[in-house]
Amino acid sequence: LMKTGLFNKVTMTIQPENSDNPNVRDLLVEVDESQTGSLNFGLMAGSDSGLIGNISLSQRNFDVADWPESWSEFWQRKAFVGAGQQFSMEFQPGDEVFNYGASLTDPRFLDSDYSLGGSVGWMSRDYNDYRQETLYSKVSVGRKFGDIWYGRLSLSADRIKLTHFDDNVPVEIFNDQGPSTINSLGISVSRTTLAPYTRPTEGSRINMSIDQYGVPSGDYTFTKTYISTTSYFAIDRDFLHRTYALRLDSKIGYIFGGESPTFEKFYLGGRSFRGFDYRSISPKGTPRVAGGDPDVSIGGDWEFYLGAQYEFPVLDKFISMVVFCDSGTVVDKPSFDEYRVSVGTGIRLYIPQLGQAPLAFDFGFPIVKEETDKKKI
């Protein structure tokens, strides 16, 4: 019930034995319903995406069939609520990223164990040497298996165009300018045992996916596989019941069975590999013009990553420090060539008014790198 996000508190009490049926006990469930709808205005800043404004409307207890009977019912927020569906709309203008989209998901479609969801939107992303514009849509069907396993089948249809090239754009990216139709059919499986669910210190999360591109049609045909794991270990607890936790991460991705465009390949760097510039860990392209930059990343078909992070409290439950080590590579074929390693430290600020995710400030320093790598502390 807590994982639905619809309740602040859930209390379960086993009722006294009934003499008429001594082998059965009733269970009293008391819930404190949370505020499920929100209209948010915000400003986000990140090392990978620049400055982004955010205007979002969300409802975690949406009902697409509950149409208002009057305008007053609509403005009093008594319509479109009550079925447990999840609806959101976002408008995100930024200096590097511009996105607007909408999504609707029914986690228990027709009161079954299956979920049904869809999303549509448009996004523009400015890279150093070009711009990528994506018109995207996705439909997915999912199902829970027990308490920890979840499977999903999804169909995606995207229209991608690369524009605003400068002289440093390599041949490989320029040839992918499109517009390109990118369709895919994907299957994903996840297993989650994180505890507690919102700020885990124990348990693990495993995600596995395989996507076949070119289904039912499209400009590219290839297969993309990906596996990621995250594990938490509670190392110690102090007298204030604060936890010292170790986090281990791994990622393996492989593209095969055809030629993939540069915008679907793997990259590491920035938040995904601290101490290196965003998307800088990757094979480099061929300069398109004389004097062009020979060190522009074009992505690889093989990604391997291992990371470790130790987090310990500093001030109550609101401020903590981390030390970390990131390692991995992105190349064209499965191997450990051009392997990089970085170490660093950071701070986490947990501010409940800003959501469950902390403000993160990390400082990474490469200790194993290639000559052409671009560092970013």
Question: What residues fall within each predicted segment?
Answer:
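Class II aminoacyl-tRNA synthetase catalytic cores and aaRS-like
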Residues: Y127, F365-K374
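Active/binding-pocket-proximal capping segment
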Residues: G121, M321-V330, E338-S342, G364-F365
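C-terminal outer-membrane beta-barrel translocator/porin domains of Gram-negative envelope proteins
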Residues: N18-L27, G37-G50, S56-S58, S154-S156, ...
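Transmembrane beta-barrel wall of Gram-negative outer-membrane proteins
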Residues: P93-Q177
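Edge/loop elements at the starts and ends of beta-strands within beta-rich repeat scaffolds
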Residues: K3, S34, D48, F80-V81, ...
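Repeated loop/turn-to-beta-strand initiation elements of outer-membrane beta-barrel proteins
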Residues: F7-V10, G37-L39, G50, N61-P68, ...
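Periplasmic polypeptide-binding modules associated with outer-membrane biogenesis and secretion
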Residues: L1-G46, E69-V97, G101-D106, Q132, ...
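Outer-membrane beta-barrel "beta-signal"
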Residues: L57, G186, G344-L354, K374-I377
